[in-house]
Structure formats: structure tokens, C-alpha cells
């Protein structure tokens, strides 16, 4: 439909160029620098609690700047061509609950899974939302890759999102700073799973995050 309605204006072109430059900066400067730091960690031997958490949070930031950088570039090119594409990231790292995070991160993918899988499953299951939520998140994990790491990643987020629906979310909203720390911590565990070579390596790093690494 936008093919018939697209408009190319100086204002839209300037905004498109700005988004393109921002995306390039995120991808080529911030993300690449952070990936380099993560690679240095992997090649080193230190596995202290603080170092493992710095690594996990660097992974989170690297994934964010990498992915949102590509999205910004796509939005920028779209505007240069006269198209208005949907925003895909809305400050996700500022979220105070995981539910809010997933409303801000990779928004269009979330819409697709919600409309084409979750809602039809809930209707078919007679409104049993929790089981459907867990199943969809296992499928989201497999969408990211076929392996135990990705299944565990999906299970992790599915269980915690279900817990937020059952009361955890209300508690996190009452204590925003703790909610924010909770989100960042879970993202750290999740990032280790997404980027690990195999489940054994990821679980070893989880041990480091829980203080079970080398002193």
C-alpha cells in the first residue's frame, strides 16, 4: 500500500539520512567495539564474578547496538525512498519488567508471534494462556536457532514472563530500580545462551554469573 502513497520530501530525506548514520555508528563503532571486548574475554582465563557480569552485559549491549543498528539503517533507507517503516526498538534496555522489555525489543517479531501463534493457540486451548505462552516461547527460541541453547533461552523467558503474569510483574513495578536490575540480569543470562558455542559453555558461564567460577 505504501508504494502508492510514499512521499519523498527534504524533511523525510534528512531524517532518513540521520537514521542511516546513527545505525552505521551503532553497528560499526559501538557493536564492533563491544564484540571485540567479548572476544577478548573468551580468549582470556579470568572467570571472576565481576568479570563474568561485565562480559554478559557487554554481550547484551553488543546485541542491542548490532541489531538496532541494522534496524536504524533499514528505517533510514526506507525514509530516503519515501517509505515509513515500523519502529522495531523503543529503548528496550530502560524496561523495568521483561513484559515491558519484549514490547520494546524486536517489536515486529513480537507482533507476528502474538497474532499468528499465541492468540490462535489461546483460542484453541480454551483460554489457557500460561501453557500457550510457554509453548510460543519455546518456538521463539527455535526461531533463533536449532539447539539446546535456544530451547533453554526460550524456556527461561517463557517461565519468567509467566511468573510476571502471576504476580512478579506487579512487584517489579512497585520497585522500579530492582525491576530494572532484574531485567538486565535476565538479559545477561539470556545473552550468554544466545551467543554460546554450546550448552556446556553457556552453563559454565552461568556458573560464573552465580559466583561459581574461578576466584
Regions found by a protein language model. Name each.
Residues 1-214:
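Membrane-embedded transmembrane alpha-helical bundles that form the catalytic cores
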Amino acid at each position: 500500500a505504501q508504494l502508492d502513497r510514499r512521499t519523498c520530501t527534504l524533511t523525510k530525506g534528512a531524517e532518513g539520512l540521520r537514521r542511516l548514520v546513527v545505525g552505521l555508528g551503532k553497528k560499526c563503532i559501538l557493536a564492533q567495539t563491544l564484540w571485540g571486548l567479548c572476544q577478548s574475554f573468551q580468549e582470556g582465563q579470568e572467570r571472576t564474578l565481576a568479570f563474568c557480569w561485565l562480559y554478559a552485559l557487554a554481550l547484551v549491549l553488543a546485541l542491542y547496538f548490532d541489531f538496532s543498528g541494522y534496524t536504524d539503517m533499514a528505517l533510514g533507507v526506507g525514509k530516503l525512498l519515501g517509505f515509513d517503516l515500523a519502529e522495531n526498538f523503543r529503548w528496550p534496555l530502560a524496561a523495568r519488567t521483561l513484559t515491558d522489555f519484549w514490547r520494546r525489543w524486536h517489536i515486529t517479531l513480537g507482533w507476528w508471534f502474538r497474532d499468528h501463534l499465541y492468540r490462535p493457540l489461546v483460542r484453541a486451548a480454551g483460554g489457557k494462556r500460561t501453557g500457550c505462552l510457554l509453548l510460543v516461547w519455546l518456538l521463539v527460541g527455535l526461531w533463533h536457532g536449532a539447539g539446546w541453547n535456544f530451547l533453554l533461552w526460550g524456556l527461561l523467558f517463557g517461565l519468567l514472563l509467566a511468573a510476571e503474569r502471576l504476580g512478579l510483574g506487579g512487584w517489579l513495578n512497585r520497585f522500579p530500580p530492582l525491576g530494572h536490575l532484574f531485567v538486565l540480569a535476565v538479559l545477561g543470562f539470556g545473552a550468554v545462551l544466545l551467543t554460546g558455542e554450546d550448552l556446556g559453555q553457556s552453563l559454565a558461564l552461568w556458573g560464573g554469573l552465580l559466583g561459581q567460577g574461578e576466584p
